[in-house]
Design a protein with these regions (language model features):
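Gly/Ser-enriched beta-turn/beta-hairpin loop segments
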Residues: 48-54, 102-106, 162-180, 235-237, ...
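A conserved glycine-rich beta-strand in the N-terminal activation segment of trypsin-fold
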Residues: 22-29, 47-68, 94-96, 122-123, ...
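Active-site region of chymotrypsin-like
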Residues: 37, 54, 114-126, 152-214, ...
Length: 353
């Protein structure tokens, strides 16, 4: 038995090695083609209202609209407060950056530079591909890892449904979203790096890492792509909230919380690849959802649609700001229907005093 397993492993390795060797030139061509659009960012920021301390640091960003001079990076790089920043391109040209958007919750934001200031380089735009991430997909993280200006780290996507990483009390922590995870070993300076596939498409945004392991955490691009479209069309990036945090729970835990067999059957049939549904984790006292939703409630329908994951929920909230939505949950096996006002998520973070 052991010999047969060893033989099978050798055969698999023998088959895979030519494929890997064939991919190397393709990766080389891709990385050379897109590297002009990746920049290192130097940041000096004051302490903001929302979790961030004053800092002088380095990070990464990449061009997503060369005509408008839009650079995508992390929220904790743009920061929620006043910031002085500059981008350094591959040929060491420097440009000043102006923050144009920082998401109130998720770890992404946009800077703008003046394209006319660039004299010797025409940076390539890196296309966003939110649907391009998949388990087992080979990726490269390109950025200013460890302050080296341009580093390339390889990895394989292992998870698409990781809970948002927790960096500790009093620090910025994302919520109401899944994260992607891969063992790519990113470190300081790689925040905001593009996570690209072999075609040069950005499938995720590097956001953080586990300092005691090789795990890296990537933000999905669904809401990022929407925000970019809004900015390109000179439209406000509307963001809605129920002032409630949700978490995804597996079906076995949902049954203990009172999920009915009918609801589980419907969810499994409609979304066969998903392994759970959303539950209420916390509700802010005094919010529109207070007294309506309770921790442990299982989210079933929103505006008549079966909602089992974060992207669908965020889309409904963002498109119904200052309007009421119909929400159906199950609590202890009983169904509860209610209407809740969607509030402006941007209004929760103060920006002046």
């Amino acid at each position: 038995m052991i010999q047969s397993r060893i033989f099978a492993a050798v055969v698999a390795l023998t088959i895979s090695l030519p494929a890997l060797a064939a991919e190397e030139p393709a990766w080389t061509q891709t990385l050379e083609r897109i590297s002009s659009g990746v920049v290192s960012i130097r940041v000096d920021s004051t302490r903001a209202f929302d979790t961030e301390w004053n800092t002088s640091s380095q990070a990464t960003g990449f061009v997503v609209d060369a005509k408008r001079g839009l650079i995508l990076t992390n929220r904790h790089v743009v920061t929620p407060g006043p910031v002085i920043a500059e981008a350094v391109f591959r040929n060491n040209e420097e440009v000043e950056l102006t923050p144009v958007y920082r998401d109130p919750v998720h770890d992404f934001g946009f800077f703008r530079y003046d394209p006319a200031e660039l004299r010797y380089i025409e940076p390539v735009e890196l296309p966003l591909a939110p649907g391009g991430a998949g388990i087992g997909k080979e990726i490269r993280v390109i950025g200013n890892d460890a302050g080296e200006q341009l580093s390339i780290l390889a990895g394989t996507i292992a998870r698409l449904d990781r809970k948002a990483p927790e960096y500790g009390r009093g620090k910025y922590n994302d919520f109401n979203t899944f994260y992607l995870q891969a063992a790519s070993g990113t470190s300081g300076g790689s925040s905001g790096s593009p996570v690209v596939n072999i075609d040069g498409e950005v499938v995720a945004l590097n956001a953080g890492a586990n300092s005691s392991a090789a795990s890296s955490f990537f933000l999905p691009l669904d809401r990022v792509e929407r925000a970019l479209r809004k900015l390109q069309n000179d439209e406000p990036v509307t963001r809605g909230t129920l002032q409630t945090t949700f978490r995804s729970e597996p079906y076995d835990e949902l049954r203990r919380l009172g999920l009915t067999e009918a609801s589980e059957t419907l969810a499994r049939k409609r979304f066969p690849s998903q392994t759970g549904m959303l539950t209420v984790e916390q509700v802010i006292p005094g919010s529109p959802a207070a007294g309506v939703l309770s921790p442990g409630d299982i989210l079933i329908n929103v505006n008549g649609e079966l909602v089992t994951e974060f992207v669908a929920l965020a889309a409904i909230l963002d498109n119904n700001v200052v309007h009421e939505i119909a929400v159906s949950v199950e609590r202890g096996g009983s169904r509860i229907d209610a209407r809740i006002q969607v509030e402006v998520l941007h209004a929760i973070t103060p920006d002046e005093y």
